[in-house]
């Protein structure tokens, strides 16, 4: 009884995983399309500053050249300053 229940559950898990993998392949035909969609979706996160440069918002990596936007603090990536 335990063996058949395990086999049924395992079969359902494999079926769901295969179905999910097919959906992901249909959504992006190539790695370039994936990168392009990531860039286009995140483009609105960049906000122009007065100096003509762009500041980084939350979850963008930051360093001495890529500054965080006002109200954010750089801790490997930009985080909202709570205090």
UniProtKB/Swiss-Prot annotation:
GO cellular component: extracellular region
Compartments, record wording: Secreted
General function of this protein: Inhibits voltage-gated potassium channels of the subtype Kv4.1/KCND1 with high affinity and shows weak effects on Kv4.2/KCND2 and Kv2.1/KCNB1 subtypes. The toxin modifies the gating behavior of the channel and may interact with the S3-S4 extracellular loop.
Something else known: Negative results: does not inhibit Kv1.1/KCNA1, Kv1.2/KCNA2, Kv1.3/KCNA3, Kv1.4/KCNA4 and Kv3.1/KCNC1 potassium channels.
Disulphides: 55-69, 62-74, 68-78
Propeptide: 22-53
Annotated domain remarks: The presence of a 'disulfide through disulfide knot' structurally defines this protein as a knottin.
Range of residues in the leader sequence: 1-21
Protein name: Kappa-theraphotoxin-Cg2a
Protein family according to the UniProt entry: Belongs to the neurotoxin 30 (phrixotoxin) family.
GO molecular function (one): toxin activity
Predominant location category: secreted
Leucine amide PTM sites in chain numbering: 82
Keywords: Amidation, Disulfide bond, Ion channel impairing toxin, Knottin, Neurotoxin, Potassium channel impairing toxin, Secreted, Signal, Toxin, Voltage-gated potassium channel impairing toxin
Distribution of this protein across tissues and organs: Expressed by the venom gland.
């Amino acid at each position: 009884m335990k063996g058949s229940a395990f086999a049924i559950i395992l079969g359902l898990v494999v079926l769901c995983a295969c179905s999910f993998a097919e959906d992901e392949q249909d959504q992006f035909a190539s790695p370039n399309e994936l990168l392009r969609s990531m860039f286009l979706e995140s483009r609105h996160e960049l906000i122009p500053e007065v100096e003509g440069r762009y500041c980084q918002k939350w979850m963008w990596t930051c360093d001495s050249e890529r500054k965080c936007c006002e109200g954010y603090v750089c801790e490997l990536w930009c985080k909202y300053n709570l205090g």
